[in-house]
Amino acid sequence: MDCDTTGIEPDFALVKFKKLAGGGYFKIINQSIPQALTAMGYAESQIQDIIRYCVGAQTLKGAPFINHETLRNKGFDDAALERLESNLIQAFEIAFAFNKFTLGETFCIEQLGFSDAQLAEPNFNMLKALGFTQEEIAAANEYCCGTMTVEGAPHLKAEHLPVFDCANRCGRIGQRF
C-alpha cells in the first residue's frame, strides 16, 4: 500500500506521526487510503467518516463523556480549553495533553484542586483524578485521536479490508497484518 517504503513491501502503518522540523508531530494517514476508497466506489462522505475514524477528530468538541461541557463543569475555563485543544492535534492519546505543562501548574492547583505532590507524581492520571472512568477516557480518546486502523470503520466492507493490510497490526484495536 503506497510507496512510502524502500521497495515493494507492505507499509508499516496506515496512520503515522511525522516529526516536524520546528518541533512537535503531525498525524498523517497513508495518502493511498482515500484513493483506494474512491476506486472501490465509496462516497466522499463515507471516505471522510473512515478517515476520521482512523485519525480522529483531533478535538474534544463533541466528544463523548470528555468534552468542553463536561470539562467546564470540572473547572476548565476558555483559556485552559484553548491550551488543551492546541495540544490535542498532535496527541497520541488525550491523557498526554492533560498535564501541568499544557494547562499550567497554577491552573491545575487553583482551579482543579490538585496538590503539588499529585502533579509531581510521574504516574498521575489527571483524567482519572477528575473522575472519568477508563471506559469514558477510551471513548473520548477514540473520538479525538482515532483508532489508527480501518478495522471497524463505518461503511467499510469486510471484503475490502485486505487492501489495507500492513506489515504490522495497526492501532490499539487492529488485528490484521
Predicted regions, residues:
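Long, C-terminal-biased catalytic regions of enzyme "large/alpha" subunits
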Residues: 1-177
